[in-house]
Structure formats: structure tokens, C-alpha cells
Design a protein with these regions (language model features):
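Bacterial N-terminal signal peptides
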Residues: 9-19
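Iron-sulfur (Fe-S) cluster-binding modules
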Residues: 300
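Beta-rich carbohydrate-recognition and catalytic domains
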Residues: 25-296, 307-333
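Bacterial Sec-dependent signal peptides at the C-terminal "C-region" and cleavage site
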Residues: 17-27
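Intrinsic low-complexity, intrinsically disordered segments enriched in polar/basic residues
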Residues: 4-5, 17, 185-187
Length: 333
């Protein structure tokens, strides 16, 4: 893969776990931006507009016939009415969008108007009451030859997560069951599907499609978008937080060897903050707020992890919600 090399961020995590397993863990993480511009930008087609959030990337499996490209990158508008799709044959692009999109809100089992959906104050006409489907978390199931997509939206009350499935990665069927809180990021561990939701609440299910059980809350109420990287019994969590100035990407880890109800996270370490104009670094530093942002700001949001051939990639939203960028994560013991 052709790669352009830009300034990297180097950090070291050195944390002493204060748990029943008493050991020291040290890991060096280097994050390297691979291109000097977002790979996804506003107005790439006639439908998508300028708000860009929530990336999730897969390698298209061989059992999908006639794919648009080797890679499918799913993303959304923060207040979107459908899940967007971009495709490419190399990770660094060029990326093109599939203008029709994938899962539409009408297929998702989320309300298409408010009311009947309501915001957190139970107001069908309040500022948080808007129909949407957003923040895809997409996985390939080779066992069932399906693409599994977790999405969130506003239900009749709070924001929640549902799941949709597809045989081709484009046409999805939504499932009606509410699985849990919004912003699922899922991973496999000990024959369960686990999911970390906002704000840091863990869930698990025996089949990944239904009956998610709520477990411990591991993060502060300001935690929102997360991404997960599993290494044996250690889970790295990348995330951003409201009320940061600027909003940036953090990392911590969780020891998965204990009973899941006893899991705790390590202290956070900063991974990445805006450093270039296309990331918003030339804009004023302001405290980030919850919800959508429709103008460029000095913020990074929405981390997502993709792994291929032993390499780890980090996607993230730039300048608030103004594009998606690509970096590589280098892990050394």
C-alpha cells in the first residue's frame, strides 16, 4: 500500500492495575496519519450534505458477488435518515460514495417522525426530538454470510441501539428489538458478543442479535464515541468526551480475564488531538458539547478501528463532523 508519512503521535501507557490480578502493563502506541487530507469529505454526492460522522470500515468478504470495491466504509450524518456507504480498492483511496446509501430509516424500526419519538425530557417537539438513524458499527459474519450493522436512533423516549443484517452489504433488514443504549461498538470474547455503549456501559449477548444483558458502567457520563481493539484478554478502548477543549481521542485498556461484571478500565492517555487545519487545528479551542455540530470546529470525534494483515488502522471524524481521516496505530510491547 502506498503511504504518505506525516507527523506521528507517540505515547506510552504504563498502568498498574489495582484489581485482584496485581500486575504492571506497559505498551507503546504510535499513531501515524496516512494521508494529509480527509478520505471522506462533504458533498461527495448529491445527497450526503456536509455533516459526516460515525465511520465503520470492513473488507468486503469473498462471498459477496460483484462488490462495488474491496472496502466498504459506512458512516452517517449525526441526524441522518440513512446510513451512507463509500467504497474503494485501497484504504487510502480514492473513495467514492454510493449515493443511494444502505439502511434507510424506514427499514430500521426507528420512528420516522417526532412525535411519536421524544427527547430526553419526554417532549415530542423538544430540541432533542428528531428522527434519525446513525453511528453504524459493522461486522462481517462469515459463519452466516451476513453483514451485521448496529445503529442508533431516537425511539419513543431515549436514544437506543437496534441491529440490521444484510447479505450484500448494501440492502439491510432492520430488526425491531431494542438492544441497549446508543453507540454500540461490539467485539467477541469467550463465546459472547460484547458491546460498549455510550456512556461506557457494557453489554453482552449469546448470539449478538438479541437479548443483550446490561453490565458495568466503565466510563464517565461525558464519554460518547468509542472504538475497540482486542488483544488476548486485553481490550483497548479509544474514545472521545464531551466537555473536552479541544475534543480529542483517548485510550485506556480493560482486563477481560475477570468476571465481566467486575471489569474496570485503566487511567486514560491522550492519543490524538487536532494538529492540522483539515482537523480543525487552526480554529479556536472551545469546550465541546453533546449533539451534532454543523460548522467546522477544533475537535476530533468518532474513532473507529479496522484491522487487516496484522496492521491496525484508526478512522476518526475531523473538524467536529466535517470529514473522516485515516491513521495507522503501531503497537509495540
Amino acid at each position: 500500500m502506498h503511504q504518505l508519512r506525516f507527523r506521528a503521535v507517540v505515547l506510552t501507557i504504563g498502568v498498574l492495575f489495582l484489581s485482584t490480578i496485581d500486575y504492571a502493563f506497559s505498551q507503546t502506541i504510535r499513531v501515524e496519519r496516512l494521508v494529509n487530507t480527509p478520505i471522506i469529505r462533504p458533498e461527495m454526492d448529491g445527497r450526503m450534505g456536509s455533516n459526516i460522522a460515525g465511520p465503520s470500515l470492513i473488507r468486503v468478504p469473498d462471498w459477496i458477488e460483484n462488490p462495488l470495491g474491496r472496502y466498504y466504509l459506512y458512516f452517517s450524518d449525526h441526524r441522518g435518515l440513512y446510513i451512507r456507504l463509500a467504497y474503494a480498492n485501497t484504504l487510502t483511496g480514492p473513495w467514492r460514495t454510493y449515493e443511494s446509501g444502505t439502511l434507510q430509516i424506514e427499514q430500521s424500526h426507528f420512528p420516522t417522525s417526532c412525535p411519536p419519538c421524544r427527547d430526553q425530557s419526554d417532549n415530542g417537539n423538544g430540541p432533542g426530538a428528531y428522527p434519525h438513524v446513525a453511528s453504524p458499527d459493522v461486522h462481517v459474519s462469515n459463519a452466516t454470510q451476513e453483514i451485521i450493522m448496529y445503529v442508533h436512533g431516537r425511539d419513543i423516549g431515549p436514544q437506543v441501539t437496534r441491529v440490521a443484517t444484510s447479505k450484500d452489504g448494501i440492502h439491510f433488514d432492520g430488526h425491531p428489538e431494542i438492544l441497549g443504549r446508543p453507540y454500540f461498538r461490539a467485539f467477541q470474547h469467550d463465546n459472547f458478543t460484547y458491546a460498549l455503549a455510550m456512556p461506557g456501559v457494557m453489554y453482552r449477548s449469546s448470539n449478538g442479535l438479541s437479548d443483550f444483558e446490561e453490565g458495568p458502567s466503565l466510563f464517565t457520563p461525558d464519554m460518547r464515541h468509542s472504538a475497540l481493539l482486542k488483544r488476548g484478554n486485553r481490550l483497548f478502548v479509544f474514545w472521545t468526551e464531551r466537555n473536552d477543549a479541544p475534543e480529542r481521542i483517548w485510550v485506556a485498556h480493560i482486563d477481560l480475564s475477570e468476571n465481566w461484571q467486575m471489569w474496570t478500565r485503566s487511567e486514560p492517555i491522550e492519543v490524538l488531538r487536532p494538529e492540522f487545519p483539515w482537523e480543525g487545528a487552526d480554529l479556536p479551542i472551545e469546550t465541546s458539547q453533546g449533539g451534532a455540530i454543523n460548522v467546522p470546529v477544533n475537535q476530533l470525534r468518532d474513532p473507529a478501528i479496522y484491522e487487516e494483515n496484522g496492521r491496525v488502522y484508526l478512522l476518526y471524524a475531523v473538524a467536529g463532523e466535517r470529514g473522516i481521516a485515516l491513521a495507522e496505530v503501531h503497537l509495540t510491547p
